[in-house]
Swiss-Prot record:
Gene3D superfamilies: Vaccinia Virus protein VP39 (3.40.50.150). Belongs to the methyltransferase superfamily. YrrT family. It comes from the Bacteria. HAMAP family: Methyltr_YrrT. SUPFAM superfamilies: S-adenosyl-L-methionine-dependent methyltransferases (SSF53335). CDD domains: AdoMet_MTases. Its EC number is 2.1.1.-. S-adenosyl-L-methionine binds at residues 53, 74, 97. It comes from Bacillus cereus (strain ATCC 10987 / NRS 248). One of its GO terms (biological process) is methylation. Could be a S-adenosyl-L-methionine-dependent methyltransferase. This is Uncharacterized methyltransferase BCE_4457. One of its GO terms (molecular function) is S-adenosylmethionine-dependent methyltransferase activity. Keywords: Methyltransferase, S-adenosyl-L-methionine, Transferase.
């Protein structure tokens, strides 16, 4: 993942918060229990936290309120501008992405919500390998994102979206890189992690991976 999604992110920046509040009927189920999902990621994190895809700063704010030290990475200039308006003045957000980033200090937890699907499965593997080198034993990756239990679950979800006339959602599901749990389990385990998957709505699972 380089900068190919930046235009999309910049366009989405000013409407993202309305999306997560369920104002777009096509994405209402995707963002169901949104606040609970963020809280779950926060509760599973500890120490110095590296956040990928800060977006408009919703997860970042909760992490800071919970007392975490947060290093935010966000590729979109528009997203960074909106997040800075919502977050403490002293908080800085660095330009970067899942594969290209700088880390100022040692990291205990790496977090992200609704973003890892921008990477292909091969890129996901490269990213997790990088994170494995960053984290000490006991360090964690906590990602919340749309993934599917298997191919059948994916196929049924796409078909259901089409039948409901949710063509934008169906197109999204077919053009982004929403992966399957067995693929992610293999990626994590091959890179030295023990991982669990917890489903928090029809689309979103929380992946909690601990470095062994």
């Amino acid at each position: 993942m380089g900068t190919e999604f930046n235009g999309l992110f910049d366009e989405w920046a000013h409407t993202y918060d309305s999306f997560v509040q369920g104002e777009d009927i096509q994405y209402k189920e995707v963002f169901a229990h949104y606040e609970d999902i963020l809280e779950d990621v926060v509760n599973k994190s500890f120490g110095n936290v590296l956040e990928f895809g800060v977006g408009t700063g919703n997860l970042t704010n909760k992490l800071l309120l919970a007392g975490r030290t947060v290093y935010g990475i966000e590729p979109s200039r528009e997203m960074r501008m909106i997040a800075k308006e919502k977050l403490p003045k002293e908080f800085s957000i660095t330009e970067g992405d899942f594969l290209s980033f700088e880390v100022p200090n040692s990291i205990d937890t790496i977090v992200s919500t609704y973003a890892f699907h921008h990477l292909t499965d091969d890129e996901k593997n490269v990213a997790i390998a990088k994170y494995s080198q960053l984290l000490n034993k006991g360090g964690k990756i906590v990602f919340a994102d749309t993934i599917f239990a298997d191919q059948d679950a994916y196929d049924k979800t796409v078909e259901a979206a089409k039948q409901r006339g949710f063509h934008e959602l169906a197109n999204d599901l077919q053009t982004e890189y929403y992966t399957r749990i067995p693929i992610m389990q293999t990626i994590f385990e091959n890179n030295g992690f023990h991982v669990t998957f917890t489903r928090l709505n029809h689309f979103v699972w929380v992946m909690e991976a601990t470095k062994q």
